[in-house]
Design a protein with these regions (language model features):
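Sec-dependent signal peptide recognition
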Residues: 1-8
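Acidic/His- and Gly-rich active-site-bordering loop/insert found
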Residues: 21-124, 128, 138-151
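Conserved small/polar residues in nucleotide/adenosyl-binding loops
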Residues: 160-166
């Protein structure tokens, strides 16, 4: 079985929506591998590539979203599942990654390769892995058509490894 490192917080928050569902787990593995291949190394960032990747998924799922750039090519995206009147729960991750010194890697750091049962690649732990964990649960809730007591907002922000102009967007 492929071992995926997901945020303990994410699994705690969604304890009733775990990734025990094999189809969802397989989908999450493929999504993470694909997301790791999206080059968002900062500098220069190019997080708009991550926005395009996530927007395609939202389009396929029929999920409305918005996006904006905090600077040229520094894209941010957010989507919402409407719920009740309680304060919204925000699922936030950043889509930029730091440069990889390839001499310390046995494979392409943007490959999303599975090594010894683990998905490897720049951003797997910080923070694209968390982003896909959030996304898998966000998609599961969207597909379930369950009534929520609060809005659930998925956000991918840019530009965290240099400065934080993203605060204008959020």
């Amino acid at each position: 079985m492929i071992k995926i490192i997901f945020s303990i917080l994410s699994l705690y928050v969604f304890s009733t929506l775990t990734l025990a569902d094999e189809d969802l787990e397989n989908e999450a593995v493929k999504l993470l591998q694909a997301y790791l291949k999206v080059d968002t190394i900062s500098p220069p960032g190019n997080e708009s590539r991550a926005v395009d990747f996530l927007a395609k998924i939202f389009d396929e799922e029929g999920i409305e979203y918005d996006s904006a750039e905090s600077a040229p090519t520094r894209g941010n995206i957010w989507a919402r599942i409407k719920g009740g009147d309680k304060p919204a729960l925000i699922l936030l991750h950043h889509s930029d990654v730091v440069p990889a010194n390839e001499e310390y890697w046995d494979f392409d750091p943007l490959s999303g390769e599975i090594v010894d049962g683990y998905i490897q690649g720049r951003g797997a732990l910080d923070m694209k892995g968390l982003g896909i964990s959030h996304l898998a649960n966000f998609l599961k809730l969207h597909r379930s058509n369950k009534s929520l007591n609060r809005d659930l907002i998925y956000i991918a922000v840019s530009y965290t490894h240099l400065t934080l102009p993203t605060k204008r967007i959020v």
